[in-house]
A protein has these predicted regions:
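Terminal helix/beta-alpha structural elements that buttress the NAD(P)+-binding lobe
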Residues: 1-143
Length: 143
């Protein structure tokens, strides 16, 4: 990564602009909503978007409106492709082996938020959609 932006900060738009003075070449999109719109508006010519999720709208009663900055994707000739994890089911074993190796080598740092107890599942799910966890959200159930 060249830079990061705290999407929960009040000044995330300023952070995004400062972090991308020359625009954005690649977006690994998992959130959607306002941040995706702001990123789309800053995409460079021949940029690429890997659309892997849109979690900001998963709990909405009505689908969110389309991005207002969608026209920039056309003008900049951006390539947008959706990716679903099940498309790579045949490679899960390979992925687990490689990722485990990288974690063991310290090349990938794994952070977790652990919630204790089966009865806390509803709270944990709400935490997930509210972005209140760091890293993976794990519910530990005593056996």
């Amino acid at each position: 990564f060249d830079a990061t932006v705290d999407y929960k900060a009040d000044d995330w738009r300023r952070q995004l602009k400062e972090a991308t003075p020359n625009g954005i070449d690649v977006d690994f999109e998992n959130v959607g909503g306002e941040i995706m719109e702001a990123v789309f508006a800053r995409m460079n010519k021949d940029g690429r978007v890997a659309l892997c999720g849109l979690i900001s709208g998963y709990n909405e009663d009505e689908p969110p409106p389309g991005p207002r900055s969608f026209g920039n994707l056309l003008i900049q000739r951006v390539k947008l492709q959706g990716f679903i994890i099940l498309d790579y089911y045949a490679r899960f074993g390979e992925g687990i082996r490689q990722l485990s190796e990288w974690v063991g080598e310290g090349r990938i740092k794994s952070e977790q938020t652990v919630v204790e107890g089966f009865e806390e599942l509803p709270r944990a799910l709400n935490m997930l959609f509210a972005g209140e966890n760091t890293g993976k959200l794990v519910v530990h159930i005593e056996s």
